[in-house]
Amino acid sequence: MPTVNQLIRKPRQAQVKRNKVPALQENPQKRGVCTRVYTTTPRKPNSALRKVAKIRLTNGFEVIGYIPGEGHNLQEHSVVMIRGGRVKDLPGVRYHIIRGVLDTQGVKNRKQRRSKYGAKRPK
């Protein structure tokens, strides 16, 4: 623990808070156009084919977004909305595509957690 004199000579430095979603530029969501839709494999110890898309945002950033849920209709030139939120086992994926908004359809036959997947209430 420093003495009062040491603190006068060299004050405490505030910790720098790093922005985890810089491409959003302090906005809750951003719109973009898919430039490439593909699958990728997660880090160890997991194994799967995760669906992701490279997205060119309206502010010029190019980011990778995760496509949640089972099945999707995205292809090149699809207009999508992204939100923050990383995928822990996919390096470089720091954004999620929002289902049920713009060109992205909601998940079919989804009964629970429907709002997260843009699914309408079943009749």
Swiss-Prot record:
Sites bearing 3-methylthioaspartic acid, chain numbering: D89
MF-aspect GO terms: rRNA binding; structural constituent of ribosome; tRNA binding
Keywords: Methylation, Ribonucleoprotein, Ribosomal protein, RNA-binding, rRNA-binding, tRNA-binding
GO BP annotations listed: translation
Quaternary structure note: Part of the 30S ribosomal subunit. Contacts proteins S8 and S17. May interact with IF1 in the 30S initiation complex.
PANTHER family according to UniProt: 30S RIBOSOMAL PROTEIN S12 FAMILY MEMBER
Role summary: With S4 and S5 plays an important role in translational accuracy.
Name of this protein: Small ribosomal subunit protein uS12
Source organism: Sinorhizobium fredii (strain NBRC 101917 / NGR234)
Source taxonomy: Bacteria, Pseudomonadati, Pseudomonadota, Alphaproteobacteria, Hyphomicrobiales
Gene transcribed to yield this protein: rpsL
